[in-house]
Each structure stands twice: as structure tokens, then as C-alpha cells.
């Protein structure tokens, strides 16, 4: 009988659903947000797919820097595709529901891919450190095997972190509450629905955030501390400019991503503002992934030349 009740409870849980409130309390905003999100989503897919294809097709881009950049672009496509289609569906029509399983999958991938990006940005900072501070030994330091290992560490760290946090968040008692005051299943919003004390879970989340968010950020700051010292010792203005251009794109991306992530995940749940959270989530789920390709290509001569080469071949074949 006990097993029957457990099985019945599990079945009811898995077949239940959540209501994603999103912007339904501001219906005049829903159509505007739908159009904006759709445009940014298409730009994200186009821009990041372009970088992935260029990195694969142009032999000049078969370097550690572009290997990691292709990983970041693929990651951004996965990150947005894991959340944006459901968001567009809920914004477009009256149905604001998401199944429990759908919510679990969305939460898992949002946490996992966000964690991957934190670690991957640190790996890219180390690559820039090796390129600027150890130029004569760069190809020895950043050999293909190490690049593959560093990328694997980034992906495994993010998915491992989510494997701990996602189930813990989903298993919180909610006393029948189904309304998620957000437009996606995000950890702070789901923790805020709990009808029990969440201090232990918040402590666990904070500890993991130190590992997955703050530790990579510290590595980034250390790497760029060394890079800055090396750049200041370069005597020629042209050399300093080249070294700065090598790193500036990555620094802009780090600032955009980490600025929102730290605010979202390193503050106590009782100080979390849902309205601020919604707009910050919009920023790092649609704006940052869409501008990443633009930031890298505008300052990168190699990517521009590769694009011209590929487009030139395409037009010649036509």
C-alpha cells in the first residue's frame, strides 16, 4: 500500500503543471516583449551559428581562441533554445502553463548551461593570458589536448552543478502553489514559492555559486591582472593596441554576463525582486547571447576575413 501511495504521488507530481505568470499582469507589454524576444532569438541563432560554421570551415580559425569561441557560440544557442520557445509560446496566447517535466528540464538546462558559461569564460581568459603573456610558448601551452580537456571541464562542471541544485529546488514543498512569478522556471522564483524554510537550500546554492560563479571570476581577474601588467610593459603603441584588442571583446562579454548572474544568484531569496529578476533574466537570456557574436566580430579581423571568404565562395558558386 505504501508503494502504491508513493507511486500515485509521483504520478500526480509528474502530471502536474506550473503557471508561468510572466508579464500576464501587464498584458499591454506581452506583444511588445514577444516581438523583441523573437527578434533577439533569431539574431542569436544567426550570429552564433555563423561563428560555429566559420570556425569549422576556415582553417585560419582552427586555433584555441576560436575553438573556445565556437564552444561559447554553441552554448549560447543551446541556452536560448532551452528557454525562449516556451517563453514565446506563453507570451503569444492565453495558455501560461508548463508541465512539471517541462519545468524540470528547463530548470536543469538553464542552471547547467549558465554554469558552463561561467567556467568557459574563465578558460577563455586563461587562453588570452597565454597568448599575451607567453606568446613564444603559446602553441605549446594551449595544445589541442589541453583545449579539449579545459572545454570538457567547463561542460562537466556546469552540468554537475545543475545535477545537484535542480532536483533540490524541484523537491521543495509548495503546499499546492502552482503560480511561478516569472516567464521561465528559474531557481530564485521556484525557491520563492516554497512553503518551508529554505535557508539550507540557499546556503547550498551559495556554496555552489562560489565554486561555479565566483571562482571562475577570480581566475578571470587574475588572468587579466597579468595581461594588464604585460600590456603596460609593451613599448610600442601598436603592440599595446593589438594586445588590448585581443582581450577587449572577451572583457565586454564577461562584464555583461557576470554583472547579471551575480545579482541574480548571489543575493538572499528574501531580497529578490521579481520585477527586477524578470528584466535581468531577459537581459542574460536574449540580449547577451545575441550581442556576443557582434562583440567578437566587430573587433576581430580574422572573423571578418573568414566571413568574406565563405560568402565570396558562396556567391561564386551561384
UniProtKB/Swiss-Prot annotation:
InterPro entries assigned to the protein according to its UniProt record, in alphabetical order: GPCR_Rhodpsn, GPCR_Rhodpsn_7TM, Olfact_rcpt
Keyword Cell membrane carried by entry: yes
Molecular functions (GO terms): G protein-coupled receptor activity; olfactory receptor activity
Record has Metal-binding as a keyword: no
Transmembrane region(s): 32-52, 64-84, 104-124, 146-166, 203-223, 246-266, 278-298
Pfam families: 7tm_4
PROSITE patterns named in the record: G_PROTEIN_RECEP_F1_1, G_PROTEIN_RECEP_F1_2
Protein keywords: Cell membrane, Disulfide bond, G-protein coupled receptor, Membrane, Olfaction, Receptor, Sensory transduction, Transducer, Transmembrane, Transmembrane helix
Signal peptide from the UniProt entry: none
Cysteines engaged in disulfide bonds, as pairs: 103-185
Residue ranges that the UniProt entry lists as topological domain Extracellular: 1-31, 85-103, 167-202, 267-277
Location, primary (coarse class): membrane
Subcellular location: Cell membrane
GO biological process entries: detection of chemical stimulus involved in sensory perception of smell
The protein's role, per its UniProt record: Odorant receptor.
UniProt-recorded name of the protein: Putative olfactory receptor 2W6
Gene: OR2W6P
Amino acid at each position: 500500500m505504501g508503494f502504491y501511495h508513493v507511486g500515485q504521488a509521483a504520478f500526480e507530481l509528474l502530471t502536474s503543471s506550473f503557471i508561468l505568470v510572466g508579464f500576464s499582469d501587464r498584458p499591454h507589454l506581452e506583444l511588445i516583449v514577444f516581438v523583441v524576444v523573437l527578434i533577439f532569438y533569431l539574431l542569436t541563432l544567426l550570429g552564433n551559428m555563423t561563428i560555429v560554421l566559420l570556425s569549422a570551415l576556415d582553417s585560419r580559425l582552427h586555433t584555441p581562441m576560436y575553438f573556445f569561441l565556437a564552444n561559447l557560440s554553441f552554448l549560447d544557442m543551446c541556452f536560448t533554445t532551452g528557454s525562449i520557445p516556451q517563453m514565446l509560446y506563453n507570451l503569444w496566447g492565453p495558455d501560461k502553463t508548463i508541465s512539471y517535466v517541462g519545468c524540470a528540464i528547463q530548470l536543469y538546462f538553464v542552471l547547467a548551461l549558465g554554469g558552463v558559461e561561467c567556467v568557459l569564460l574563465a578558460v577563455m581568459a586563461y587562453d588570452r593570458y597565454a597568448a599575451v603573456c607567453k606568446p613564444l610558448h603559446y602553441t605549446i601551452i594551449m595544445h589541442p589536448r589541453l583545449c579539449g580537456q579545459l572545454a570538457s571541464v567547463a561542460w562537466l562542471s556546469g552540468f554537475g552543478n545543475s545535477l545537484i541544485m535542480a532536483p533540490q529546488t524541484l523537491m521543495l514543498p509548495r503546499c499546492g502553489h502552482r503560480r511561478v512569478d516569472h516567464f521561465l522556471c528559474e531557481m530564485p522564483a521556484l525557491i520563492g514559492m516554497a512553503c518551508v524554510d529554505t535557508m539550507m537550500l540557499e546556503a547550498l546554492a551559495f556554496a555552489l555559486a562560489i565554486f561555479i560563479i565566483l571562482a571562475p571570476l577570480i581566475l578571470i581577474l587574475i588572468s587579466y591582472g597579468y595581461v594588464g601588467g604585460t600590456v603596460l610593459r609593451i613599448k610600442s603603441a601598436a603592440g599595446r593596441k593589438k594586445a588590448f584588442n585581443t582581450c577587449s571583446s572577451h572583457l565586454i562579454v564577461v562584464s555583461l554576463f557576470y554583472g547579471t548572474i551575480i545579482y541574480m544568484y548571489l543575493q538572499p531569496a528574501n531580497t529578490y525582486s521579481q520585477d527586477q529578476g524578470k528584466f535581468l533574466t531577459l537581459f542574460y537570456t536574449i540580449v547577451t547571447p545575441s550581442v556576443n557574436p557582434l562583440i567578437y566580430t566587430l573587433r576581430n579581423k580574422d572573423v571578418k576575413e573568414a566571413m568574406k571568404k565563405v560568402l565570396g565562395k558562396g556567391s561564386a558558386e551561384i
